[in-house]
Each structure stands twice: as structure tokens, then as C-alpha cells.
């Protein structure tokens, strides 16, 4: 193995992570432990400020479907919990794995293709939004 691949594989075997629903409950997220903890703390802080039944219900489902203290198997693979996979991906066997900001997203390929088509359809608006952000950044400098 190339040294970089070997290091990444060793890192995966050593590191622990959380397998949970993604925020929209349409796919699976693989969070580094610290990212997951910050996410939960954020929602807990919001709920302490003002109790909200919807947020409490969301967090109850989110936490009950989260698998903490996960690690790669001896071959460096991530094994998705069967119940979570079934609930989030249904019977789909083909999945796409994508980096999504601070976590990995595992989604059914068929759903991902629909999202990709929507993304492509809105690409001009996305570029315009990026241009606007860059213009705002130039003004700060």
C-alpha cells in the first residue's frame, strides 16, 4: 500500500466515530466523535434556553438511532448497523459515500442521483451565491 493510504487506514482503525441519521433522516452520517458531541451540545443548549417539544422529539429520535463508540473493522471497513441502514436506506443496496462538511454522508444512490440532478439544475444560482459571498469577502479586506 502507498504510505498515505496505509496511514489513512491505520487512522480509521484507531479512531472512533458515531454512525447516526443525517439531520434530515434521509441518509446516514458518520461523524467524528467530537463533531457529534458538539452537535448534541448545540441542540441541548438551544433546548435549555427555551424548552421546545419538537426539538426534544427530534433529539430523542436522533439519539435513539445513533451508534456511538464505533470503529472500523480489522480491514478498515465501516459496518453500518442493520437497523439504521434499513430505516434510512430501505432495501437499497447501492449507496454513495460523500464528504459533507464535517462528516461523511451515506445515501441511496437512486436518491443521490435525484439530488445531483436538482443540484445541476440550480448550479447557476449556486454560482451567483458564491460570487456574492466572494464579493462580500473582498469588501472586508
Give the location of each predicted region.
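Single conserved hydrophobic/aromatic residue that forms the stacking wall/gate
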Residues: 1-13
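Flexible "stalk/tail and boundary" regions
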Residues: 10, 14-74, 83-141
Amino acid at each position: 500500500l502507498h504510505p498515505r493510504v496505509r496511514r489513512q487506514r491505520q487512522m480509521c482503525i484507531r479512531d472512533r466515530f458515531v454512525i447516526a441519521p443525517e439531520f434530515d433522516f434521509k441518509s446516514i452520517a458518520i461523524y467524528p466523535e467530537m463533531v457529534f458531541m458538539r452537535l448534541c451540545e448545540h441542540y441541548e443548549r438551544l433546548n435549555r434556553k427555551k424548552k421546545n417539544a419538537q426539538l426534544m422529539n427530534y433529539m430523542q429520535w436522533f439519539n435513539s438511532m445513533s451508534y456511538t463508540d464505533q470503529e472500523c473493522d480489522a480491514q478498515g471497513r465501516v459496518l453500518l448497523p442493520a437497523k439504521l441502514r434499513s430505516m434510512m436506506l430501505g432495501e437499497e443496496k447501492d449507496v454513495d459515500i460523500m464528504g459533507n462538511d464535517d462528516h461523511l454522508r451515506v445515501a441511496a444512490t437512486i436518491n443521490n442521483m435525484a439530488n445531483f440532478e436538482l443540484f445541476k439544475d440550480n448550479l447557476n444560482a449556486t454560482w451567483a451565491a458564491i460570487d456574492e459571498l466572494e464579493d462580500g469577502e473582498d469588501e472586508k479586506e
